[in-house]
Amino acid sequence: MRISIENVTNILNANRVGSRNAEIDWILTDSRSLCFAEETLFFALKSKRNDGHKYIPELYDRGVRNFVVSDLPKELEHYSDANFLQLANPLKGLQRLAEKYRARFDVPVVGITGSNGKTVVKEWLYQLLSPERIITRSPRSYNSQIGVPLSVWLMTERTELGIFEAGISEMGEMEALQSIIRPSIGILTNIGGAHQENFYSVTDKCMEKLALFKECDVVIYDADNEMISGCVSKSLFGAREIAWSRKDDDRPLYIEWIKKGEKTTTIRYRYLGMPNEYTIPFIDDASVENSLHCLAVALYMMLP
């Protein structure tokens, strides 16, 4: 779904230098990933270790003519047929553009967060659901402040379901990711020690992750984890909960038993009172937990 450079300029409220007509199909933050130069908009992002502005000459020589920058090139006359959209923070611009792009789509979107298991759950869900739907999902582990906008930009008019990861490393980061992903189905995989140094407590980290689900229709999590259950209660979601449990048979998804063999695990469950079972080719606890998250989504979406 193309977007004109004029529309991009307006969305970003940027200072535009250049008058070249352009239609944007691709956004880029890594010069090594360039594919279709004429249709690409490059965001020159700055970090502690790198500065995207230094790749502008190379990308220009390779055919890119549209750039989002905080600093204009010193030899601007060398780029007379290029567009430069200047704004104070290109990263915020990238997120803003992705947020507006996401708003074009009225399809179910699964948002996955947690300390571990995000990518596995995403890939398993893709395998479970893709025979029935055209799915856009995060590439690899694209779950950061940069990766999430790039992932959402992959949605097209053919997308019927989105599955995106969201990862955070400090307080306040989830708000931007939520506004980009805007999930209707939320999964909290678990809460562990990753990036704990940037949070006051594990509870604070859990509450920050749950901010991804503030507009969800349904939220899926492990009800046997008392800390997670307590945080969900504090969050006062208006969403329906599909909390799975091995202990509480009043939960929507009750796990009756789990039997592990040498190479497989069989799980017996009841969903809304209806019993069934399935077998996975894994015996580790993490895989069992990941499979239960996937099961809950499949049941919610009424798959057999």
Language model features with spans:
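Structural signal for conserved beta-strand scaffold positions within catalytic alpha/beta enzyme cores
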Residues: 29, 44, 69, 86-87, ...
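Conserved beta-strand segments of alpha/beta enzyme cores
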Residues: 15, 83, 134, 240-242, ...
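Thr-Gly-centered strand-to-loop micro-motif
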Residues: 43-46, 137-139, 164-165, 280-281, ...
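Phosphate-binding loop of NTP-binding sites
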Residues: 12, 92-240, 298-301
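Acidic, Mg2+-coordinating active-site environments of NTP-dependent enzymes
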Residues: 73-79, 187-304
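ATP-dependent carboxylate-amine ligase
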Residues: 1-16, 36-41, 136, 210, ...
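Residues that form or flank phosphate/diphosphate-binding pockets in enzymes
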Residues: 37, 50-54, 120, 146, ...
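N-terminal leader/targeting and accessory segments in enzymes
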Residues: 1-96, 256, 283
